[in-house]
């Protein structure tokens, strides 16, 4: 959530910065709401003062033995007016809050301006795409050859955009997750978490999923009440971030580094995007997610660090990739700056996003009231939060299958995964 004080003091600047990400801030609506809020606040304060004065008059009159029936009637009317005014004020404040919750984060000045993929800035490439002297198969074909990817039965069990994995492919999928978790815990210093896959509305609002992405979530409806108290997590970022909701940390505790492997559930039924075949866009997929909660002065530095942690996954797997700085129109709702890591898929002859690494600044911290106290200045200040996929396991699996394929349809196992694959060298 954007700082409400910044909205009130410099609305035109906020509108200008949000326009860089193609978001039109309704300035007139906000000013009208703010003007009405101030009027209601003054009326409320005036009535409260009048009621207090009336109470004193009644007290004095009673002490003199005077008839106070008429004065009490006036006080009663004032009380009714005040109650009505407070309710009106509360409803207005709720509308203002909903308006503020609908605003995306302000892009950092370093973020390139634009709204198309061509406007993203390529920072670097790592590794060279392999050369093959045989017809390249995509991961769907390789999964069929090795009898490990079963889209047909997944459709029978549930519907489209789900997958059944079995045998050595399922083993490889598990090996990738174990390798990633071990890397981030043992080498990068994260603490591993096991999390609920269902979260409540407060958690979704806190992470910035609501109200913006309501239709992209799988909601769990309570049969008796008809309400949606829970939703399946779209990413482990949601529960991880909310672990510091309503928490005040000491500066010495920072940074907090958390990692989790969870399934993720996203409705996203559209066919938008560059790649939709196979494991690339699923309703259910697994992901290793890293989250850091940091001192506000260090978040841009930590963005480089957390991105490098995701990059090491791809480097150790020896998968060619490129690092992209997203333009203003492509960064996520809560992000102020985002790097995407795109892994090379030979069958597509293109790069495909496998990790998104974002600095969210104080956008989530303001929603969840996550703060810290400094060593010298003990006044509570908002923290900064960052998140990074470390990485999407299904897409990493697709990349391993395609980049390590052999002419006879077998797939070589990356050497770094050997300890997790019972030392087998190939998927047959």
Swiss-Prot record:
PROSITE patterns: AA_TRNA_LIGASE_II (PS50862). Pathway: Aminoacyl-tRNA biosynthesis; selenocysteinyl-tRNA(Sec) biosynthesis; L-seryl-tRNA(Sec) from L-serine and tRNA(Sec): step 1/1. It comes from the Bacteria. Its main location: cytoplasm. GO terms for molecular function: ATP binding; serine-tRNA ligase activity. It catalyses: tRNA(Ser) + L-serine + ATP = L-seryl-tRNA(Ser) + AMP + diphosphate + H(+); tRNA(Sec) + L-serine + ATP = L-seryl-tRNA(Sec) + AMP + diphosphate + H(+). GO terms for cellular component: cytoplasm. It is found in: Cytoplasm. The keyword Cell division does not apply. Pfam families: Seryl_tRNA_N, tRNA-synt_2b. Its EC number is 6.1.1.11. Keywords: Aminoacyl-tRNA synthetase, ATP-binding, Cytoplasm, Ligase, Nucleotide-binding, Protein biosynthesis. ATP binds at residues 266-268, 353-356. L-serine binds at residues 235-237, 289, 389. GO terms for biological process: selenocysteine biosynthetic process; seryl-tRNA aminoacylation. HAMAP family: Ser_tRNA_synth_type1. Catalyzes the attachment of serine to tRNA(Ser). Is also able to aminoacylate tRNA(Sec) with serine, to form the misacylated tRNA L-seryl-tRNA(Sec), which will be further converted into selenocysteinyl-tRNA(Sec). NCBIfam families: serS. Homodimer. The tRNA molecule binds across the dimer. Belongs to the class-II aminoacyl-tRNA synthetase family. Type-1 seryl-tRNA synthetase subfamily. Consists of two distinct domains, a catalytic core and a N-terminal extension that is involved in tRNA binding. This is Serine--tRNA ligase. The gene is serS.
């Amino acid at each position: 959530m954007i700082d409400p004080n910044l909205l009130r003091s410099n609305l035109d600047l906020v509108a200008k910065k949000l326009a860089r990400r193609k978001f039109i801030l309704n300035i007139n609506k906000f000013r009208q709401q703010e003007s009405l809020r101030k009027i209601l606040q003054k009326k409320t304060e005036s009535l409260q003062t009048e009621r207090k004065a009336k109470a004193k008059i009644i007290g004095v009159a009673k002490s003199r033995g005077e008839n106070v029936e008429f004065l009490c009637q006036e006080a009663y009317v004032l009380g009714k007016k005040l109650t009505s005014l407070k309710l009106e004020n509360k409803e207005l404040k709720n509308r203002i809050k909903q308006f503020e919750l609908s605003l995306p984060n302000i892009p950092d000045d370093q973020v390139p301006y634009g709204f198309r993929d061509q406007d993203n800035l390529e920072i670097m490439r790592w590794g060279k795409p392999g050369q093959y002297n045989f017809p390249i198969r995509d991961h769907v074909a390789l999964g069929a050859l090795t009898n490990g990817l079963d889209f047909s039965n997944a459709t029978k069990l549930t519907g489209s955009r789900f997958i059944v994995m079995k045998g050595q492919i399922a083993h490889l999928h598990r090996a990738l997750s174990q390798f990633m978790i071990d890397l981030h815990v043992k080498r990068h210093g994260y603490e591993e978490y096991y999390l609920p896959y269902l979260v409540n509305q407060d958690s979704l609002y806190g992470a910035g999923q609501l109200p913006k992405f309501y239709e992209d979530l799988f909601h769990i409806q309570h049969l008796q009440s008809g309400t949606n108290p829970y939703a399946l997590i779209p990413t482990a970022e949601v529960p991880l971030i909310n672990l510091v909701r309503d928490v005040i940390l000491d500066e010495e505790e920072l940074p907090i580094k958390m990692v989790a492997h969870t399934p993720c559930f996203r409705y996203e039924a559209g066919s938008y995007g560059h790649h939709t075949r196979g494991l690339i866009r699923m309703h259910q997929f697994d992901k290793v997610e890293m989250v850091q909660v940091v001192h506000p002065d260090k978040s841009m530095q930590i963005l480089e660090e957390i991105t490098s942690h995701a990059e090491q996954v791809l480097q150790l797997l020896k998968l060619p990739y490129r690092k992209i700085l997203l333009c203003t129109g492509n960064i996520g709702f809560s992000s102020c700056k985002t790097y995407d890591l795109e892994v090379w898929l030979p069958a597509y002859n293109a790069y495909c996003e496998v990790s998104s690494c974002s600095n969210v600044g104080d956008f989530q911290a303001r929603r969840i009231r996550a703060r810290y106290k400094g060593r010298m200045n003990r006044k509570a200040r908002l923290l900064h939060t960052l998140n990074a996929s470390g990485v999407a396991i299904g897409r990493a699996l697709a990349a391993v299958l395609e980049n390590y394929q052999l002419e006879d349809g077998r797939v070589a196992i990356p050497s770094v995964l050997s300890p997790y694959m019972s030392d087998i060298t190939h998927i047959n």
